Amino acid sequence: MSHKINFLNHVKFSFFIGDKMKVIYILMGCLLITACGSSNEPVDSSAPQTAVVEYVWQTKGPNYSDEALEKLIDSWNEKVTEGGYDMIGANILVPQFQPDTHDFVWVLRWPSMEARDYAWDHFQANYDQEWNKERAGIFSDNDEDVYAFSPSLGRPMKAGNGNTFEAEFNFCNYNEGYGESDLKKFRQDFGDYLDEDEMENGEGTFWYVMLDPLFEPTANVQHTDYLWLNIWGSKEDKDSGYARYAETDLQTQADTFSTCQRFPHSGRVIR
């Protein structure tokens, strides 16, 4: 079932790695929370809920400017505050390459799918018309391009992370004869390396998460075996971290069991 979407409108999900554009999205401040139970079981309000991060592709219009975007961010934040939505935060992600599908991504972070659904429904009923009028000609959502994921923390976020950051999405498929056990072994070895690196060079701003899609693949997008998201607090930390990483055998180990594509982005916190 397909739905035309506005910025906060109730939609179905799809996973995106199309031929022209593999993916754009980012997570900041993710929560590691256990999965929800079966829908056939009674709801336990005390049970942990699954955090959700979703990405809304945006296309610039003829009247776009950075100043106009800032005014719209302020207006959107006022609406979200007035609506009282249970939202962890929001970011904007700009690809550091040239996708032909969109110009930037608006990222929404929720403590649960229930909180997400309530906010989308309430926003549509109370603010949608005004919001669409305000941003007409400046930017627009891409139809159907709203994508949700469940995050799991691989390395804790460091205190050095601020309102701007660098992110890199690694879309990976296992090579023939390899699988999850090889990824698990690599993550253990990588964690040991990070511990040693921090002891030698001090604590940096690097952290990472694994992202699992909450939807079925579509004609435009196919699943990969795993999705690894790296995050740094600055471009300088990213470059120096990669330089030290290149002196190890870890990349060779990773290339042995899987083949990955990297997609770099710059991001900033807007809520």
Across the structure, where does each feature detected by a protein language model lie?
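Sec-dependent signal peptide recognition
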Residues: 21-29
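Short, Lys/Arg-enriched N-terminal segments with co-localized hydrophobic residues
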Residues: 3-20
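Intrinsically disordered, low-complexity segments enriched in Ser/Pro/Gly/Ala and basic residues
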Residues: 1, 13, 29, 37-38
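Short S/T/G/P-rich N-terminal loop/turn motif that feeds into the first structured element of a domain
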Residues: 36-271
